[in-house]
Amino acid sequence: MARTAPAASFESLESDLDQKFAYPASSKTYIPGSRPDIRVPMRTILQTSTRTEKGEMPNPPIPVYDTSGPYSDPDVHIDLKAGLPALREKWIAERGDTEVLPGLSSEYGRDRANDPATAHLRFAQLTNPRRAKAGANVSQMHYARKGIITPEMEYVALRESLNLQALYDKPEYKALLRQHPGNALGAGLPLRPEDITPEFVRNEIATGRAIIPANINHTELEPMAIGRNFRVKINGNLGNSAVTSSLAEEVEKMVWSIRWGADTIMDLSTGKHIHETREWILRNSPVPIGTVPIYQALDKTGGIAEDLTWEMFRDTLIEQAEQGVDYFTIHAGVLLRYVPLTADRVTGIVSRGGSIMAKWCLAHHKENFLYTHFDEICEIMKAYDVSFSLGDGLRPGCIADSNDDAQFGELRTLGELTAKAWKHDVQVMIEGPGHVPLQRIQANMDEELKHCYEAPFYTLGPLVTDIAPGYDHITSGIGAANIGWMGTAMLCYVTPKEHLGLPDKEDVREGIITYKIAAHAADLAKGWPGAQLRDNALSKARFEFRWEDQFNLGLDPERARSYHDATLPAEGAKIAHFCSMCGPKFCSMKITQEVRDYAASLPKEAQQGMEEKSIEFLKKGSKIYS
């Protein structure tokens, strides 16, 4: 349902866009915090009862992590032109270390605000931005290192635990909460839901093992954490280009992405109206928004990398920080001396940001200005609490180029920059590859942990083979599940259109679901507390032929239902004890249930006799022939 309407049609966005949505058989619930304005959302999936000979046995509701914000709350009115409620406004103001500016600090921002040519695109409900008071640092890391537990940290603790500790004493959840031991591969995961406390979150932020990307100007944000010792998160990309996609479509894609489970969104726009597109997305986004500021800076030069300047880039950082961008991808590790190391690669430099900075370095024969001005960038970041996503500008673009000197040289420089950012108490995550065959993935995680001091790793896949254009959501999902288990904190999704074109809504959905699978598989492998609850509930529903519950407990209920109904569309098939794969006579689960029923119906004496024969068999050494 991609739209190609011009940006000028944005006036009709509110009527065009399906803003509200409801998940099937679900309710929006909130976990209360220590103060009335801390209400942490989660989704509860309702189940039908199990039919037995003794009557119906109820099945308990299943709580799941929710990224959809107010869009799935039937009690909240969504007005895209007004933006979402300013959830964090009071928290930020009462800390007393910020000030509301009299106007925009960015020259470009002021120009756009006063340009009559963009008046019809402008978000009308803008307020003046905030900035740290002189000498103040407003980053979550700074507060954490001072021993302060912020409302954002408490919010994250409640969100990560889902209040599961309350379920462990309830008999109806006992079987559902069974979980295989995980292997956290050295990570310090909480062992039980009750261990996920605000103090646990504060400590993870203070050490740099996790970040809470939360710009003080993105007050609509529902705080979340990215870190090795939390749930594995996923990022979804959107953004217009010079050849396709309208402003309204990007807002629609944002809402669509969080519906399917994107934990953060990166706006990678390179086409028209980048500033206005970003404003509308931010004001209506409950999840953190990241950008690559060099893209917009390049747009300001007319696309000529050689004309980039530090002054122009600095103005772009301030412009975006005052809009509320939560994390910046900064390609400060692409050093002049690393560029020649890519000469013998099969695919050279595939990162857009990396290639821009490499071209600038070669054109001027100077060191990367993002590297030389890094301390000044840190000063901007801590004034707005923007997190670094230190870009892997020299990531491999094919498996042949994986783990080479250029890639790992840059990674070591990112570790150096991480230490420098932490001296400013600025939050950092590290971007990673890319294209890496399975047997070389572990080395990427090991190198990141070693050289970047356990700062959260944020990887694009990696793709484990290069032979499947059109299916790279699968080739990358395989790598993502593996590296997520090994310790990567956030996985950047890949869609089926990767390497082929700009994704549309269905591509976005496909990519997000693929990566939700990868992230959940990683959580199971690590042993995240309660991760297996949803699996157990769905497996029980499957065995009991509760088809509606199977659909609703899945990551994509619509897809599951449509596949089932393609061959068995009748409503009666929703209670049938078979599907079209095996039919009514060959369903293994149906046969197993019949065996159980038969065993249960045997006289007590017959059951006792079989037990005696079993004991006799075991005493003889379990030998069939003697």
UniProtKB/Swiss-Prot annotation:
Zn(2+) binds at H435, H499. One of its GO terms (cellular component) is cytosol. It is an enzyme of class 4 (lyase). InterPro entries: ThiC, ThiC-associated_dom, ThiC/Bza_core_dom, ThiC/BzaA/B. Substrate binds at N237, M266, Y295, H331, S351, R352, G353, D392, G393, L394, R395, E431, Y458. Binds 1 [4Fe-4S] cluster per subunit. The cluster is coordinated with 3 cysteines and an exchangeable S-adenosyl-L-methionine. Pathway: Cofactor biosynthesis; thiamine diphosphate biosynthesis. Its cofactor is [4Fe-4S] cluster. It comes from the Bacteria. The keyword Oxidoreductase does not apply. The keyword Metal-binding applies. [4Fe-4S] cluster binds at C579, C582, C587. GO terms for molecular function: 4 iron, 4 sulfur cluster binding; carbon-carbon lyase activity; zinc ion binding. One of its GO terms (biological process) is thiamine biosynthetic process. Its EC number is 4.1.99.17. It catalyses: 5-amino-1-(5-phospho-beta-D-ribosyl)imidazole + S-adenosyl-L-methionine = 4-amino-2-methyl-5-(phosphooxymethyl)pyrimidine + CO + 5'-deoxyadenosine + formate + L-methionine + 3 H(+). Keywords: 4Fe-4S, Iron, Iron-sulfur, Lyase, Metal-binding, S-adenosyl-L-methionine, Thiamine biosynthesis, Zinc. Belongs to the ThiC family. Homodimer. NCBIfam families: PRK09284.1, PRK13352.1, thiC. Catalyzes the synthesis of the hydroxymethylpyrimidine phosphate (HMP-P) moiety of thiamine from aminoimidazole ribotide (AIR) in a radical S-adenosyl-L-methionine (SAM)-dependent reaction. This is Phosphomethylpyrimidine synthase. It comes from Cupriavidus pinatubonensis (strain JMP 134 / LMG 1197) (Cupriavidus necator (strain JMP 134)).
